[in-house]
Amino acid sequence: MNNQAGHFVQQWRNLRSHAFDIEQNSTAGKTLMLSLWGRPARVYTNANLSIVSGQECNADCPFCVEKLRRTNEDGVFEKPTQAGEAIFLRALDSALDELTPLNPSVSVTGGEPSLDPRLPEILSLLQRRNARKITVTTNGSGLFERRQGATMLDWITGAGARHINISRASVDDARNAALMRMPDGLDSAGLGEVIRLASARGTRPRLSCALMDGEVDNMEGVLEYLQFAKRLGADNVIFRELMKPDPATVSRYNPVAAFCEGARARLAPILRQVSRNDDFRFIRQVMGYYYYVEVWGYGGMDVVFEGADLGLIDFMKRKTPGVIHEFVIRSDGRLGSSWHAREEPLGPPWLAGAMEPAALRGA
């Protein structure tokens, strides 16, 4: 299994997701048969459930992962359709019922969850359902806003969230605002306060840094960022290579795809330097069906490096036909089996357009 400490496999680093094999090197090593609204489905046992906030993000990052995920076949970004709160919560509750035997980890992502007025109800539902390993990914800008008598950060920690991932592109406040095109984001002092409060309440903060040429793009930049995180009290950082788009659905002229291709700092040279640096201690490799992760220890911190390629989603689905690797609850309440915006939904069947069983064929 690939999550055992101390056993590094060079071939996995070289091939990344192309080496992914459920039985040989995945975290769970097996699949599980489920019934989704009466239809059989074979599911990877460590599949995650992502809940997509329909709240439009107040940042305009030129490297935005969501804009790559929701780009249609013409290369145009499709803004998410948002169901009413009651319908969305009913759909989420129904999906959690169907996924009970799987007991997936749950991530809330965006859009921008910290600005979503539905977030308190979403988190309350997850808490009532005893959802496993709740993670919220945010740019942090709305964490001190009050909803229903408490701050958004209060709601996140009060729901027992395991992690809060906070996007931060630069150690410098002004540069971070410029890179993320978000003048109203958290400054370093505010970020430090979020880290302090979340940590004290049992929710582990993790800073997320996109690797970009001219910004954090080499070992020196990584070390500077880690020192910045440590000063703020964070003990968990992830460095992400800019995601590769799916060429079948995203035009190379798409502005986000073009930016990512031009600004992508390569992860491989950084990983080679990490391997040679005695201050880093290897922990594990994680193989995903379209992503590859390495986890290292550094000065009491967990340091994560990730590379992902959206073009591998369809490739891996053909390689493992009938297997669902992850679940996504879109902002319209429909449950999907990938991030593809136009994928046929799995359910619930009472939502219009959720009857097609294409993702289940071959299960």
Question: Can you say where each PLM-predicted feature lies in the sequence?
Answer:
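Radical SAM enzyme [4Fe-4S]-AdoMet core and its adjacent flexible, acidic
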Residues: 174-189, 196-318
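Canonical Radical SAM [4Fe-4S] cluster-binding loop centered on the CxxxCxxC motif
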Residues: 18-91
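Flexible mid-to-C-terminal extensions adjoining Fe-S/redox cofactors in radical SAM and related proteins
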Residues: 3-5, 16-18, 32-36, 40, ...
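Core AdoMet radical
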Residues: 48, 52, 68-87, 99-116, ...
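Mobile, glycine- and charge-enriched loop segments
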Residues: 91-149, 187-219, 263-274, 299-302, ...
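Short, solvent-exposed loop/turn segments at secondary-structure junctions
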Residues: 58, 170-171, 212, 243-244, ...
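Non-catalytic positions within long, well-ordered alpha-helices that form the structural scaffold/packing
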Residues: 99, 127, 157, 227-230
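A broadly conserved sequence feature marking short terminus-proximal activation segments
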Residues: 2-33, 290-295
